[in-house]
Amino acid sequence: MPVNYATPAADQLFPVAGVRLGVAEAEIRKKNRRDLTLVALDAGCTVAGVFTQNRFCAAPVQLCRNHLAGGHEIRALVINTGIANAGTGEPGRQTAQASCDAVAELLGIKAEQVLPFSTGVILEPLPVERLKAGLPAAKADLKADNWHAAAHAIMTTDTVAKAASRVVTVNGKKISISGVSKGAGMIKPNMATMLGFLATDASIAQGMLDKLVKEAADASFNCITVDGDTSTNDSFVMIASGQSGASFATETDAGWAEVKAAIIAVSVELAQAIVRDGEGATKFITVAVEGGKDSEECRKVGYAIGHSPLVKTAFFASDPNLGRILAAVGYAGINDLDVDGVRVWLDEVLVAEKGGRAAAYKEEDGARVMAQAEITVRVDLGRGAAKASVYTCDFSYDYVKINADYRS
């Protein structure tokens, strides 16, 4: 079960004018499950995205990049689960193109106006004829209040659907923001198997949206790790339909700061939901690193701790074997780090300082914190004012079982 997370009810996920979603059972890999999602966008939407940095990026990722770089007005997204269409070479690229062609014909748009997404098993061909056969049902299901169904339809090893919504009012205009994400394993995004889709009915200039999607990813999806693996298919897409009447052309526009903060908050909620549902996770851990020369070195330390199987298994066992955290700080790649200046806390319990165990630290205090479902590891590098946070989870027996049984 996820750590302190429940899928919002359908009526808690607000429609975004200009964006309609439909789902269908296409039997991409398994029967009797919704595994195909179609998103139709009204004319005038702006769209931006960031994608995996894995060199074996999936065929749909390659096509998405091309369609966005070409400046085409995006009118549709098509998402399948079960098969990732990654590691499939030229046939995979042809399959991704065929998906776009089929959506374009169905909706009366151009193939270049379609963004395809796939998630699931790598190295297996996508049964595109099944996808195409499922599209009419997905089209028939298109509606603005379908975020809840879409959140379920993009799941793979997820145990819960992940979604979030906010409404903000600026300059007298009500602005809706809704999004869904999926992922539970192969999670160490580097936008760089994680997918995130967010839409708002604000009007946002293309250049601002391009910048915002990167900033939001850096504050959210690029701060999470379940197992340290970067998927071939990671994608985060942001849509601005412009139908609320609220328009933002420059970053100095009145109300922009509030809208931007709300969009980033939804992104963080979607990203943290992935960690809370990490495969086999029993604990949610925030690694908050401060006192760095820059945020990049803080993030390095955060990821060193968050990736470490030894640290993560200690959290699962509620075992305050905290030397593992110090070891991770030491190998994080900060070559001129003065270890005597480093301090480490578990929540408010000071664990280490001056190069060793804190004088007042008692193991029973560490064990008490380690037994909690939510824990903050705070590290002060003592060398500057920068800070960054990484979100991770523990490693349990179930992580091994889930991944050992994944294809069965």
Curated annotation (Swiss-Prot):
Binding site for substrate: 156, 182, 193, 279, 403, 408
Site (Involved in the stabilization of negative charge on the oxyanion by the formation of the oxyanion hole): 119-120
Transmembrane helix found in the keyword field: no
GO BP terms, alphabetized: L-arginine biosynthetic process; ornithine biosynthetic process
Pathway the protein acts in: Amino-acid biosynthesis; L-arginine biosynthesis; L-ornithine and N-acetyl-L-glutamate from L-glutamate and N(2)-acetyl-L-ornithine (cyclic): step 1/1; Amino-acid biosynthesis; L-arginine biosynthesis; N(2)-acetyl-L-ornithine from L-glutamate: step 1/4
Localization per Swiss-Prot or TrEMBL: Cytoplasm
Protein keywords: Acyltransferase, Amino-acid biosynthesis, Arginine biosynthesis, Autocatalytic cleavage, Cytoplasm, Multifunctional enzyme, Transferase
Catalytic activities: N(2)-acetyl-L-ornithine + L-glutamate = N-acetyl-L-glutamate + L-ornithine; L-glutamate + acetyl-CoA = N-acetyl-L-glutamate + CoA + H(+)
Recorded GO CC terms: cytoplasm
Annotated catalytic residues: 193 (nucleophile)
EC number: 2.3.1.35, 2.3.1.1
Molecular function per GO: glutamate N-acetyltransferase activity; L-glutamate N-acetyltransferase activity
Similarity comment: family membership: Belongs to the ArgJ family.
Quaternary structure and partners: Heterotetramer of two alpha and two beta chains.
Role noted for this protein: Catalyzes two activities which are involved in the cyclic version of arginine biosynthesis: the synthesis of N-acetylglutamate from glutamate and acetyl-CoA as the acetyl donor, and of ornithine by transacetylation between N(2)-acetylornithine and glutamate.
NCBIfam families xref list: ArgJ, PRK05388.1
Protein name, entry field: Arginine biosynthesis bifunctional protein ArgJ
Biological source species: Dechloromonas aromatica (strain RCB)
